[in-house]
Structures are given as structure tokens and as C-alpha cells.
Amino acid sequence: MDTLEEPECPPHKNRIFVSSSKDFEGYPSKAIVPVQFVALLTSIHLTETKCLLGFSNFERRGDQSQEDQYLIKLKFKDRGSERLARITISLLCQYFDIELPDLDSDSGASPTVILRDIHLERLCFSSCKALYVSKHGNYTLFLEDIKPLDLVSVISTISTKSTNSSKHSSSELISECDLNNSLVDIFNNLIEMNRDEKNRFKFVKLIHYDIELKKFVQDQQKVLSQKSKAAAINPFFVPNRLGIPYIESQNEFNSQLMTLNVDEPTTDISNMGEEMHDSADPIEDSDSSTTSSTGKYFSSKSYIQSQTPERKTSVPNNWHDDDSGSKRKRKLSFHSPNASSIRKAISYEQLSLASVGSVERLEGKIVGMNPPQFASINEFKYCTLKLYFTQLLPNVPDKVLVPGVNCIEIVIPTRERICELFGVLNCQSDKISDILLLEKPDRISVEVERILWDNDKTASPGMAVWSLKNISTDTQAQAQVQVPAQSSASIDPSRTRMSKMARKDPTIEFCQLGLDTFETKYITMFGMLVSCSFDKPAFISFVFSDFTKNDIVQNYLYDRYLIDYENKLELNEGFKAIMYKNQFETFDSKLRKIFNNGLRDLQNGRDENLSQYGIVCKMNIKVKMYNGKLNAIVRECEPVPHSQISSIASPSQCEHLRLFYQRAFKRIGESAISRYFEEYRRFFPIHRNGSHLAKLRFDEVKHEPKKSPTTPALAEHIPDLNADVSSFDVKFTDISSLLDSSARLPRPQQTHKSNTLYSCEGRIIAIEYHASDLCFHITNELPLLQTRGLAPERVLQLHIITSKNFAYFFNRSSAYLQRQPLEEKYTQLAQFLGHSFKFNITSSLTLFPDTTVALQIWCPIECTFRELQQQLAHPKVAAAPDSGSLDCAINATVNPLRLLAAQNGVTVKKEEDNDDDAGAVPTS
């Protein structure tokens, strides 16, 4: 394609719809043709001399897909056309939420913006009208009109194309048909790219990846799969007739099979053994043999065997998977007319006896997860995500959950699997909680599969656990039914998903912000508006401060003084952010309700500083490093009047505000605030004292938590690791007795701590480590007898929770443990794997956040890293042959006199350890 000049007066011709740039090959060598196409925006090239937009439908040509098949030029002849081009680019990026950081350049020269591979982050569908100009075999496309297409409306258009076809005239059908076919082709090409392990495009890495998009892609996969099977199978030799799973021959020895073709039935794994190491595909289809019963689900086909550097799951070789119906599954079809069959009471004991490979479909409620709070997918490098599922019955559910007794513990074993189920950018506790409807009474449907779980810190062959395979919610199904059958051109862009996700962004202070070179984060911050600039036509620039400091590199802070010109923010004490016009209009309208004026009216002439108003804002911000500097885009901004705090901020965010008020009051100064008392009292909890000076009054900042008047609150009790043993009733027992289901049944009034201490012996078979929870999986069953993996019901989980207990266990300060890399601590714990130890444990309750439901857990007492090392060094003491005898049951790490005295009801004074370095954790 060559660069030609656009004709001044293009001819009036009928516009031709093109589905590929290959259509241009049949055009005359010298021609001017109006054309139209639909494609994905892939690149933006904006310099001082030209403006180019790249589009592609990713049609394959040979072995590679041709990117930027349509390279469109915008007019750039003079200042007027240049300004129009920049406004067009700005509006287009604003629609698709693409940041343009350099448009706010401080220099006088026109900024340069070069963005590539936009489709790797977001799908920007666009309908373009262009002028095709060719000469001597070369051609150029000149943009005449561009219409961005919202992804929600694109999916709706494809899904309802058959319905719409009957409502249009024949002339309209041509355009609608071309539009639908192009959109379908693009999605099909993206699916092929997603399957290709070498291609960087993956659906789960998209910013707007969610359950709706996932289900739509799966539906498209099924259509592609049916077409490919119909074309590929030889009618004279059909492998499936012989009971053999069909799979293309070129994939038989492909170690990355599951990333290439997820639509084919699962291959026979009986001959693969331990040699096949797969990585789960981000978008997978449901198993072909259960399509009728799992079509309602929104997640992927279960991976039978997957391995990652951190963790792997597997199935025994004697378990055969084929299409002959011999799978060990108990199917409960959602399409069965007898809907009550799925709501029958769950037998948790029967579920605990299920064999590996079994699949169950259940309806009920996920009431909690562990860890309950996390901010990043990287926190699961050394632990799993556990969900606690219970059935919804007419009676009031139990307040105390005991896995295997009145609930099911569902494990998501790997980081990759978490991303696959919820999306890369949804891997935060608040967002996953929202997806799972933890805070709502709605029921959900889950499909779980029995798998073997093990990792680097798990004794072979691992544990048989229930893993989440599919999930469905009624609210999502209703939302899909209610989507109107309209064309993409008539549907306004949906911002509902963005606002919903923004409410779940983690709340941090400016000093806590850290970014890697290519990292993008979505955060919530509270801050005071310091200054505002309307210099740029495409967006508004702001300076905010929460009065914490961060040395991250950013653009210069303008007009940064705080009421008095002499009192200026330091350059690392605030941050510069931009807001596009549609977000600003919403923000400005809220300010008008408070001040009866907009921001422009509040400014004093050309003075851009607004610190005299004390405007406190809650901001949902997208942050990223661009050209080595902080690029912050405010996606949603809301003023926070002090009288409305309880409706705007959550209880945890109120604590952020409380600290913010203290910093702001100290930094701005009591005298300065007093001069603008009437303005500041709108946003700050202040009152006048006897000297007519402003004072903070925190009693007005309290956030009233929601209380249930009919439900007595459970008391969470996490015992201290260094608790006095003499305060417990000591019982010597074994793990089997503690795991007995009747013994673990929650008591009706179990709302207080346990006073019983159990002394028992167990072998550590797995270790999970999270920043908030250290978990030892222990059992007393012999390893030689376990050839199919231990069931969780035969394993006791010991949890060490709270920073105080962490510090006591490692004999280090909390500050030191926060600085110490997770890998280092995890490696130190590995030496205990597979060995038997004596433990003193007690039953405890941990509450799920914002609920009245508690989880029963086991916590050790008098257990430290050093004490476990001592037991490891003296195996005869730690692993006695008769675990039932009194002498052998006493933990070698606890003073035996104290235990015996406690058993006889005698209190023994705890002796202090004078060896300061005795408990130091070795580095190796």
C-alpha cells in the first residue's frame, strides 16, 4: 500500500462492503471507490506529520495472520485537519478506555502517540467508512467515518442475528448480513489465535474478560467444533464407532495439546501416565458427552491433568475417559423436567467417598472463601483458593461450617485455573466475591470434579479434592434473556460492567502505589482536589493529594499550593491524573448539587488552584507507567461530603478516610482551614472551638455496620500460639478421632472458644503458605497404603493465622516477615514435609468477612519453627510407635510437666526463655 493524496471531490458512488483486504486485489489499478468494513482496532500511529489507524480481522494468509490489514490515513494537511484528527483519536480512545498519556505534554510540540497490539488488552470493534484510492497498483485508504461498536452490543448482534433478519427489508439485509458475517469471522479467527500456544492473544488477558464473554466464546467454539468434525471425519473410518476418542493425528504427540484444540473430546489418558504435562487453555469447551447437561454453565471443560511450575493435578492411570458412557459421573441434568431432583439434600458423607474423576452438579450457595482477602493472583503461588459450598434448604443454614459435615470444600488448585475461571483482572477477593454472589442470597449452580491435588510441598500421590469445574448463576441467565435484539448501531455503549468492577478495586493510599514497567492496575483512592486545568480539549487535568508521599516518576504538579501560596505540596506528595469529558460531566454535576456551581465557576479567573474548597473525592483510577512516567486516568470520581460518607464509603474505606482527615488537617494547617471553615465543613468532620479555630471531630465519621436483629453474632476466636497450656483441658488422642464426622458436628450454641487441647501425632503431607495463613495438612495414615490419594476427610488442616502468631512461629518481627520474600519462607518449611510431629491443637472459629457464618478450623498451640526443627532432629521422640500411650503422645516441644499438671488441674508457671537467639530461623 502506497501513500496517495485524497481527492478533493470524491465521486458519488455506492459504497461497497469489503470483508477482507484481499477484495482490493480485484479493483482497477486506478480507481476511487467508497468502501466499508468491520474490524478490530490494533494500532494508532500519531505524529507531527501523519495519523494512521490500523485495523485487522486476523484472517490467516498462509501460516501467519495478517495484522493491520486495513491501514487508514486521516487528513493531516493543515492545522485544522490535524486538530480534527487528534480529536477523532481522542474520542475513539475515550470510548474504548484507551489512555493517551502524551497528549498532556508540557512542551509546545505536538505529542507523538504510538500504540501497538491494542487487541491484546481489549477488543475494539469498529465500523469504518473509507475512500479507496489507487494508482499504478498502489492504494491508500482515507478515513471518512468511524463508528466504535460496544462489545456487549456486538455479542448481542451475533447471538440474535437470526431474529433480526426477519425484521429488515432486502436492502437492509445485505448490510446486516455483511456485518454479522464479519463479526462472526473475527471472533472465529480470535478463537483460533487463542488456541495457538505461540500466539500472544489470550481471552483471559483481556481487560473486559468476564463470564458473559466466556460463555459466548464457548458457544462459538461449539459451532466451530461441529463444523470441523463434520469436515474432518472420513465416513469410511470413524474412530468414535470403535469407542476411541477422536483427535487429529498431528496433535497426538503434542505436549501442549490442551492449548491447541479445546473442542475435541478428551483424549484417552490411560497410556499417557505421568509424561503428559499440559497447561490449561484459557477458554475451553464443555465435555462433548455432557453438552446437554452443561450447556448452561459458563466455564471451561475440566482439565483432566495439568501441571504448572507450582502445582499439578492428575488422575490415576486406571481411570479411563472415553465417549462410551463409562465415565464415573453422576449426572443431574439442568434441563430435566424434574427440577426438584437437583435440590435434594446433599449427602456430604457420600461426596467424601467419591472416586477420582467423579463429577457432581449441585445447587446451593458459596458462603465463603479462604484466604478471605487477597489483592493479586500472585498470592496463590504457594497456596490454593478454597470455596465453601452449602446447599440452600428451607431451614436456616448452619452458622458454623465444617467441611465434609455440612459443607463442601471446593479447591481451585492453580493460579492459571483461577484466571481461567474469573479472568486475569478479576483475581482480587472483592471481585471474585462479587462474581460468586457471596454478599447476595442468590443461589448458584456448580459443577465440581474429584481430582488429585499436589504441589512441590505435597507428599505423593497427593490428596483427592473437589475442584471447581463450572459455575452458573440464575441472575446471569436472566440478564442474557433480557438482552434486546437490536443491532450494534442502535445500542449505546454499556458502562455498567466498568462501574461494577470499579467498585471492587482495592483501596490504597498514594504511598502504597507501586508499578512495574508494563503493569496496569485499577485502584481506588481518596484524596483532596488541589488544582484543575481545562487547557486540553479532549480531557481535564487534575492534581490530587492524600498527603502521603511516593517517589514514583510523574509529570510536574502545577498550582500545587494549599490555600496559602507559601504552603506548597512537595513534588512527591500528590499525583497528576486526567479525566475524560463524559466522566467529568458526571463528576461536575455532583459538585453543582453541593456548591450550586461547576468547577469552572469555582476557579478564580485563571487561577487553577481549588484547595480553598477542600473537595474530598473518591476516585477509581487506572494507573500505568508510560514512557517512564506515571499515567493515571480517572475512570470514576465522586465527591465525598462528610454527611454522605456512610453511603459512599465502606467500613474499611471509612478507616482510610479517618487517617486521611488527620493527615490533611495537619498538613494544611488549622489556621488556614479556619479561614475557609464553611467550605471545609462540607467535606471534613470539623467544628469550631472556643478560639473560633477549626478542630477535627471524629465522632461524626463513624460508619454504622449492618446488624441482624434476629441472629446472634458468632464470636471469632483465633488462639495465640503461645497460649498457656494450663488454661486448657488436655486430652490425648489421635487424628482419626478428631476427624470422625459425628465428633465434628457443630454444636447448636457453638459461639465461644474451645477449652479443650488435643495432643496428637501427625505426618505433614502438604504445606500451603499465604501471607495471612500458614496451613499444615497432617494425617496419621501410612504413606504405603495410600495409592489413590488421601481424601480431605482423612486429613487435618492446622492453620496459623494473624501476624502475631506468624511472628511467634518464625521468631521474627512482623516487619521482618513482611520484608522477607515468600519463596524464602516457603523453602524453609519444605524440610518438614513427609515427617511426623507431635501437635497440640484446639478447635477454633474464623468468621467470613461481612457475614454471620463461621468456619471451624484447627489451630496449633505452642508450635514454632524451632520446635518443629527440634522434633525433626530427634525422630525417636517425635515419632513414637504407640501414639496412644501417654508418654509418646506428649509433644516434645512442650514442657511435659506443664501438660501433666494441666491434666491434673494444676497451674504451672511458664518459664521465660533467656536465649534470645534460640528461636532464630536459619536461612537454609
Curated annotation (Swiss-Prot):
What GO CC annotations are associated with the protein?
chromosome, telomeric region; CST complex; nuclear telomere cap complex
Known outcome of mutating residue 228 to P: Disrupts interaction with POL1 but not FUN12
Source domain of life is: Eukaryota
**Any one GO molecular-function label of the UniProt entry:** identical protein binding
Query: Which residues does the record list as Phosphoserine (modified residue)?
Result: 306, 333
**Phenotype when changing residue 72 to T:** Disrupts interaction with POL1 and FUN12
SUPFAM superfamilies in alphabetical order: Nucleic acid-binding proteins (SSF50249)
Q: Where is this region: Disordered?
A: 265-336
Which one Pfam family would you cite for this protein?
A: POT1
Q: What results from changing residue 243 to R?
A: Disrupts interaction with POL1 and FUN12
Under InterPro entries, the record lists:
Cdc13_N, Cdc13_OB2, Cdc13_OB4_dimer, NA-bd_OB-fold, POT1, Telomer_end-bd_POT1/Cdc13
**Segments of skewed composition (Polar residues):** 295-308
Q: What is the effect of changing residue 124 to R?
A: Disrupts interaction with POL1 but not FUN12
Phosphothreonine: modified positions:
308
Where, per UniProt, does this protein localize?
Chromosome, Telomere
Q: Which residues bind DNA?
A: 500-686
- Where is composition skewed (Basic and acidic residues) in this entry? 309-326
Q: What else is known?
A: Present with 319 molecules/cell in log phase SD medium.
Question: Entry's PANTHER family?
Answer: PROTECTION OF TELOMERES 1 (PTHR14513), PROTECTION OF TELOMERES PROTEIN 1 (PTHR14513:SF0)
Q: Explain the purpose of this protein.
A: Single-stranded telomeric DNA-binding protein that regulates telomere replication. Has a role in both positive and negative regulation. Promotes [TG(1-3)] strand lengthening via interaction with EST1. Promotes [C(1-3)A] strand re-synthesis by DNA polymerase alpha via interaction with POL1. Negatively regulates telomere elongation of the G strand via binding with STN1 thereby inhibiting telomerase activity.
This protein is called Cell division control protein 13
Q: Which organism is it from?
A: Saccharomyces cerevisiae (strain ATCC 204508 / S288c)
